[in-house]
Amino acid sequence: MRTIDGMKTITKIATQKRAGRYSIELDNQFAFGVAESVLIKYGLAKGRTLDEDLITQIKYDDAIAKALTIALNYLGHALRTTKQIKQKMRDKAVDEDIQAQVIAQLTQLGYVDDQNYANHYVATKKLITPKGPHVIRLALQQAGVAENMIEQALATYTFDEQCRIATKIAEKLAQGYQRESTRLRQQKMV
């Protein structure tokens, strides 16, 4: 049921096994799958005709929707940096231009904020798993946080807090060396 000028007609829209995904048949042949958001955005319905340019745009928008789903699922477990999200999308074979659009969209929505990540990371490491500023700096650098953001986050880590945490760690180590001689204990502590 082809129409004029290379236009194709949607002959069937069916749900896929994965929730929120739909199969589109053009001229009684499977053409592509789309996310529900793309289906709604383009008003895809049985009987609608599509040209090649529109089909290409629909497929591109669907690729963005897939990448956004990957990123949101990854973000659902914990705060993430831009670098971590890009790496996750790269692992799932998402194109660079689509990655950039997804990151821009997530940043605009406030879901990705490297400064916020750094601040929360420092606060968590101070309270839950006591770590010094050097270890925290290395972890944040590995996560892809910019140096100025790391500096800003570590500025909240006061010298008194560092001393308190160092004392706590030293006391914990001392308990492990109680059976050792005093001289050996001091050597291991330094």
What residues fall within each predicted segment?
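An alpha-helical, amphipathic repeat domain used for nucleic-acid recognition
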Residues: 2-190
